[in-house]
């Protein structure tokens, strides 16, 4: 009897109940003209309250820049179906380091790269038009970029883009590129690897990278969340490290984000895309004490007020009184905009 009680107690601790939470947005951005899809955030190092939200308008062929009040501060048109977007810090360019925004330009089969001016808070196109093509040699949907996540390698500051596409094979769905500055102050791409298993059901769009811990996560939308090393030169770069998030989802697995905390602590977030009330599944960033790649048990399930969410982004950086513990940004389909959620402490199960 004693052994059975011990085993039952251990099992209960290992499978602690998942918290069910209900969040409402603190604010929202202005609407885009066409169809909002994916957000990113740039943290202003001088004044975090003047940080920027960047969002794609895929049918409006534009990239929007918002302040934290949701006001449009810049619109960049002429981008042929921008699907997803990400931000990275510290690209060496023309003798200085530059923070960048990179978006997939699906109908042009390339990436669009922008420098962020930290003084004017405006974006400037620095794409090398002859060197930004992705999925070269592929055809149709296999050449159409969708998701993107940027990775800055800690040991040398090299910046990479991990890119997903509309369709792809079972074993190399994602391609990874190094961002290489040119003598003329532009940025071109250098392909470094193909990787990423795919179930064959649906597609892979959402990708996220944990810069600090060096992992890339992506959503195989009707199957689960997969994890690899982000460094293409890692000895186990081709090894699938984890598959999780296979249970409980009612809709497609869409946006993915990382909410980092001290050390290796924090959360991995993935959207369960639902009409009117998309849900966010929250997993432990650090895994378990026995296995850092074990993310099977969700910490929380957050019910939100966002409709049919595709892309999400999160930050734990304090952003002033409105967002003292950071925020969660979620695409909101019905209103063609992005919801801003004040991050709230999660119960410690």
Task: Give the location of each predicted region.
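Asp-box/WD-like beta-propeller blade repeats and closely related beta-sheet repeat scaffolds
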Residues: 110, 115-159, 164-165
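Surface loop/turn motifs at the tips and blade-to-blade linkers of beta-strand repeat domains
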Residues: 29-33, 76-79, 135-141, 195-200, ...
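Loop/turn-rich, solvent-exposed surfaces of beta-rich toroidal or solenoidal domains
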Residues: 248-297
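Short loop/turn segments immediately following beta-strands, especially the blade-tip
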Residues: 44-46, 91-92, 113-125, 176-187, ...
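Structural signature of eukaryotic scaffold interfaces centered on beta-propeller domains
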Residues: 35-49, 84-97, 142-157, 202-214, ...
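Blade-loop segments of beta-propeller domains
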Residues: 68-109
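Conserved blade-ending motifs and adjacent loop-strand segments that build the rim/top face
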Residues: 83, 242-255, 290-319
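Beta-strand-rich domains and repeat architectures in extracellular enzymes and scaffolds
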Residues: 26-61
């Amino acid at each position: 009897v004693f052994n059975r009680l011990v085993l039952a107690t251990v099992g209960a601790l290992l499978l602690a109940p998942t918290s069910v939470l209900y969040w409402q947005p603190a604010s929202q951005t202005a609407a885009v003209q066409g169809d909002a899809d994916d957000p990113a955030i740039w943290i202003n190092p001088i004044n975090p309250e003047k940080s920027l939200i960047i969002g794609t308008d895929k049918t409006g062929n534009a990239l929007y820049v918002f302040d934290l009040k949701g006001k449009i501060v810049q619109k960049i048109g002429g981008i042929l179906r921008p699907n997803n977007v990400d931000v990275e810090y510290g690209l060496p360019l023309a003798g200085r380091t530059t923070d960048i925004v990179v978006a997939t330009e699906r109908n042009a089969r390339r990436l669009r790269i922008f420098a962020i001016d930290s003084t004017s808070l405006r974006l400037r196109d620095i794409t090398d038009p002859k060197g930004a093509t992705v999925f070269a040699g592929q055809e149709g949907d296999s050449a159409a970029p969708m998701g993107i996540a940027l990775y800055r390698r800690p040991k040398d500051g090299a910046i990479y883009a991990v890119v997903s596409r509309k369709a792809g094979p079972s074993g190399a769905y994602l391609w990874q590129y190094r961002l290489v500055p040119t003598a003329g102050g532009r940025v071109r791409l250098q392909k470094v690897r193909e990787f990423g298993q795919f179930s064959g059901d649906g597609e892979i769009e959402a990708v996220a990278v944990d810069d600090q811990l060096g992992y890339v996560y992506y959503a195989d939308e009707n199957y689960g969340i997969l994890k690899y090393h982000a460094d293409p030169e890692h000895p186990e770069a081709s090894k699938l490290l984890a598959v999780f998030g296979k249970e409980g989802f009612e809709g497609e697995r869409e946006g993915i984000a990382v909410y980092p905390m001290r050390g290796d602590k924090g959360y991995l977030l993935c959207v369960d895309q639902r009409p009117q009330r998309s849900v966010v599944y929250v997993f432990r960033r650090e895994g378990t004490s026995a296995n850092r790649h074990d993310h099977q048990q969700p910490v929380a399930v957050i019910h939100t007020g966002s409709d049919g969410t595709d892309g999400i982004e999160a930050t734990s950086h304090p952003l002033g009184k409105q967002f003292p513990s950071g925020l969660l940004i979620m695409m909101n389909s019905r209103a063609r905009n992005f919801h801003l959620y004040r991050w709230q402490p999660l119960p410690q199960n």
